[in-house]
UniProtKB/Swiss-Prot annotation:
A Gene Ontology term for the protein's cellular component: viral nucleocapsid
Species lineage: Viruses, Riboviria, Pararnavirae, Artverviricota, Revtraviricetes
Annotated protein name in UniProt: Gag polyprotein
Gene giving rise to this polypeptide: gag
Residues bearing the modification Phosphoserine: S150
Species per Swiss-Prot/TrEMBL record: Human immunodeficiency virus type 2 subtype A (isolate ST)
Lipid-linked residues (N-myristoyl glycine): G2
GO molecular function terms noted in the UniProt entry: RNA binding; structural molecule activity; zinc ion binding
Length: 521
């Protein structure tokens, strides 16, 4: 521990603790980072004493620099730490790790040239576009040579098949990875697929059918001279009866070249498209937007299913213009119909961006509540006859006394006097029952006229008492009539009938049931 701490001492240790781990970060380097770097050097067979000098750090960087692009996170962290230690030994001020790496790179380029490109190995790389053939076939000194596919390309193809499981993305992925390949390379890609052997068998059947069609359309011309290259058959294009050299010669011969690689790729694409339809049985007519599904998710599913459809581009265009709007949910369909005829996809996505979300539901709820809580419209005639409210406190119209903002009036609101309220005001009119509760008779009765020359010896009779006596006598007579038997009442009616004008039907007939039912009884 002590030896490792002796890598940086005094001012150098202080300089280390001022350098940040990341640009703009809070954490800074500590001595524990040097201890960790010394432990990691043992894994690469390097002595930890190399960290004590600038030259030693430069040797470490020379070893680690080629490994950084493909190295692990620990290797990259070790390289960064050594760069910081090198800057401290070289007295180069750095604020953070990135700045230290830049200074190390500039120094190595200027002095040791270690950051230049590593010398190319025996394996050729892809030529720039326009300078030669495609990547699997290279032109070296005027001759075409074959370069096998890299394991990385094969691994990418296998991962694509395993993850997408013959989705619509497999066909364009195969086209990108097999660009410029020979039938030999394409067969390598197909042989790397371990699972999905049912799909592989479908592809083999398609290859056999296409090879038979090729043989039928391109018959053998006849015997060829010795040393002349034969014409490819269907099995030659499939790579089963031809070598890589023959395939390259057919592809790049000066006269009548046959692109066997492109032809074989087209056969494979036909088989992959059949596999896509088999593994994705969903019809585009069944793609419909859910009631709560965002419009963008629905569009993604729609175009994914449309991509798997192997139809004419005109038919796909019709499906996009018709089915995309027709199969949307009612909320989005209402918005899309307002955009006019043939709107663009960008306009549809922008218009339906918030449809179906909580914000749109809240707006619809607010509009519904606003309509429900709105006052009912009053007809014009009823509005004209409507009485205006008058305040008892201030005497103004338009509000009630409960809503009045003026000071409260004291005393009775009717007469303005104190000592009572309006409900008990003596100046109020009498009700229809007569006198009020205070014992004062109403003043709207006519006064009896007294003849001239006569002086009454007694007080005049009150008209109210006379009317009350008359009503009492009339009620007494009605009670007596109700108590009399039926026979006496009938005799009274008969006597009244004899006194009056005779009519067609007598009272006795009226009292009999025959008056109701006629001759039926």
């Amino acid at each position: 521990m002590g030896a490792r701490n002796s890598v940086l001492r005094g001012k150098k240790a202080d300089e280390l603790e001022k350098i940040r781990l990341r640009p703009g970060g809070k954490k800074k380097y500590r001595l524990k980072h040097i201890v960790w770097a010394a432990n990691e050097l043992d894994r690469f067979g390097l002595a930890e004493s190399l960290l004590e000098s600038k030259e030693g750090c430069q040797k470490i960087l020379t070893v680690l620099d080629p490994l950084v692009p493909t190295g692990s996170e620990n290797l990259k962290s070790l390289f960064n730490t050594v760069c910081v230690i090198w800057c401290i030994h070289a007295e180069e001020k750095a604020k953070d790790t990135e700045e230290a790496k830049q200074k190390v790179q500039r120094h190595l380029v200027a002095e040791t040239k270690t950051t230049e490109k590593m010398p190319s190995t025996s394996r050729p790389t892809a030529p720039p576009s326009g300078n030669g053939g495609n990547f699997p076939v290279q032109q070296v000194a005027g001759n075409y040579t074959h370069v096998p596919l890299s394991p990385r390309t094969l691994n990418a193809w296998v991962k694509l098949v395993e993850e997408k499981k013959f989705g619509a993305e497999v066909v364009p992925g195969f086209q990108a990875l097999s660009e410029g390949c020979t039938p030999y390379d394409i067969n390598q890609m197909l042989n790397c697929v371990g699972d999905h052997q049912a799909a592989m068998q479908i592809i083999r059947e398609i290859i056999n059918e296409e090879a038979a069609d090729w043989d039928a359309q391109h018959p053998i011309p006849g015997p060829l001279p010795a040393g002349q290259l034969r014409e490819p058959r269907g099995s030659d294009i499939a790579g089963t009866t031809s070598t890589v050299e023959e395939q390259i010669q057919w592809m790049f011969r000066p006269q009548n070249p046959v692109p066997v690689g492109s032809i074989y790729r087209r056969w494979i694409q036909i088989g992959l498209q059949k596999c896509v339809r088999m593994y994705n049985p969903t019809n585009i007519l069944d793609i419909k937007q859910g009631p709560k599904e965002p419009f963008q998710s629905y569009v993604d599913r729609f175009y994914k299913s449309l991509r798997a459809e192997q139809t004419d581009p005109a038919v796909k265009n019709w499906m996009t213009q018709t089915l995309l709007v027709q199969n949307a949910n009612p909320d989005c369909k209402l918005v899309l119909k307002g955009l006019g005829i043939n709107p663009t996809l960008e306009e549809m996505l922008t218009a339906c961006q918030g449809v179906g979300g909580p914000g749109q539901k809240a707006r619809l709820m607010a509009e519904a509540l606003k309509e429900a809580m709105a006052p009912a419209p009053i007809p014009f005639a009823a509005a004209q006859q409507r009485r205006t409210i008058k305040c008892w406190n201030c005497g103004k119209e338009g509000h009630s006394a409960r809503q009045c903002r003026a000071p409260r009036r004291q005393g009775c609101w009717k007469c303005g006097k104190a000592g009572h309220i309006m409900a008990k005001c003596p100046e109020r009119q009498a009700g229809f029952l007569g006198l009020g509760p205070w014992g004062k008779k109403p003043r709207n009765f006519p006064v009896a006229q007294i003849p001239q020359g006569l002086t009454p010896t007694a007080p005049p009779i009150d008209p109210v008492e006379d009317l009350l006596e008359k009503y009492m006598q009339q009620g007494k007579r009605q009670r007596e009539q109700r108590e009399r038997p039926y026979k006496e009442v009938t005799e009274d009616f008969l006597q009244l009938e004899k006194q009056e004008t005779p009519c067609r039907e007598t009272t006795e007939d009226l009292l009999h049931l025959n008056s109701l039912f006629g001759k039926d009884q």
